[in-house]
């Protein structure tokens, strides 16, 4: 079964986190998503001083794509002298994972990946976030 509810949580993720109940219930769904996002951020081991915007974008990409593909992109960034904590650099390498040559690089563990949906997801969430912030600050 596919993603469910407001935060589009996969049922298998709910099981992994031991969360039962109705995933279409907004409160249950959002609470589970918060747990998932928090676990993702903690597991990424960002360098001190990593800007919150970069953190947010990288975590959102993990939430959407699965952490493995983003870890690959961060490994590629690190290997080729880019910043694995910069969304600009990580998104560049994430988009390159659709290339079979890049996907076969020794830094890649999770194979090829078409990142277009994930990159759009991150852009859309961040644009909505900016809109909400600007409306709230009025």
Predicted regions located by residue number:
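Short, surface-exposed glycine/acidic/tryptophan-bearing loops
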Residues: 1-16, 79
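Non-catalytic cell-wall polysaccharide-engagement segments
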Residues: 15-138
